[in-house]
């Protein structure tokens, strides 16, 4: 399996400049989408709680969030392709199949693989964007070089510092790191509310209130320094001219390029 995953990860075209467009044909579909977004908001709050708890290591909070995202991608793979999703993704990757199911499975499987790698690989930024339109939503799984954006909150883990410090400065660094984690926890907790505001329930809002919404987020790590960011994104109302009746891959929208220009540091590269 490890050999297959290395081969799969070598195909940078799987994610690059692409997104998954999923139809929202009725209120039941909207409710499911809303539920998924509320799960993301809840995960933000759980991460904030863990960061604010001095008895929980920063790495544990970081890995818990990564594992949660990876599990969601695995569920998507199974929903699209069944239990043989890995075989289907690999078949698409090597050119043995060229169909919609194969393309979607390969997309989410690549995202799954990269999320699993981020537990041990640093200096790689997770930079997704989720957009709601009147009849559909899009998910663009992005990764970029580096570990932060121009608007990220930074916080440190003294357990991951390789510096040799004397006792006095080590205690000061430890306390400053805990303070940075508490500051980050407050920021991350606020981002959960942004998600809830951008994607309201179909049972508690009018169609006009919920037909457009969007967020982009970013998370990264470099050594002992971790970063988080989440902000609203204004969807382009002219992005799609034709409806869609099943999930499919589409080119990324103008919103993706705009957020890259606004948020990625100079020299950063979308992977």
Curated annotation (Swiss-Prot):
Any one GO BP annotation for this protein: cell swimming
Gene disruption phenotype: Cells having transposon insertions in this gene are hypermotile.
Region (Disordered): 233-261
Tree of life domain: Archaea
Disulfide bond residue pairs: none
InterPro entries the UniProt entry points to: HVO_2248-like
Feature: compositional bias, Basic and acidic residues: 251-261
Pfam families to which the protein is assigned, alphabetical: HVO_2248
Role: May be involved in swimming motility.
UniProt protein name: Uncharacterized motility-related protein HVO_2248
Native species: Haloferax volcanii (strain ATCC 29605 / DSM 3757 / JCM 8879 / NBRC 14742 / NCIMB 2012 / VKM B-1768 / DS2)
Lineage of producing organism: Archaea, Methanobacteriati, Methanobacteriota, Stenosarchaea group, Halobacteria
